Amino acid sequence: MAKSVKNRKRVAPTRRHLSMRHRRRTPHCPLGKSKDHKRNLVRMFMEMLNAVKLYHWNTHSFSQHKATDELHSRLSENVDKFMEVLLGKDASRLKHLDKKIALINARNTSDFKTRIHEYREYFVNMNTCFDSHRDSDLLNIRDEILADLNQFLYLLTLK
């Protein structure tokens, strides 16, 4: 004879259950497996910087030309700082990097804006990859990069 639902004994969730539940609710780390974080970051940073510079060279709009130049300059500075802080945390160097990096050449402003939104989403989800206490320095630099991208998206709305 089956026990009624009311009489079933409740079992406290285990750590495994809690971590699985937590994992389902939060977006996954965009950097992939932890052993590949640095390699994936370098690839993404280089692709982003190259995409901004290619758009800078190809645009016919003077305001977009100036805005992308400023964005590239700020991103380059913040990316350099981010990677130096990251590498300084464990006194490591980059090894076994991919030899090929995609060159993303946006066809028009709409495509480029979409790409910038994708980069922004990548950085927003990056907080799932780092510990908010131990890696607050990296997350602060990430926030500066997000501010640069958001300011640039605003500047694209100007004529």
Please give the residue ranges for each predicted region.
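Arg/Lys-rich, intrinsically disordered low-complexity tails that mediate electrostatic binding
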Residues: 1-36
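Hydrophobic core segments within long, regular secondary-structure runs in both alpha-
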Residues: 49, 76-79, 120, 146
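Amphipathic alpha-helical coiled-coil segments
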Residues: 81-86, 152-159
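Conserved alpha-helical segments that form or flank metal/cofactor-binding pockets of metalloenzymes
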Residues: 63-95
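Non-transmembrane amphipathic alpha-helical segments
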Residues: 45, 52, 82, 123-126, ...
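Disorder-to-helix initiation segments
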Residues: 30-42, 48, 108-112
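Helix-loop segments that flank and shape redox-cofactor active sites
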Residues: 47-70, 129-136
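Acidic/histidine-rich alpha-helical segments that form the ligand environment
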Residues: 101-156
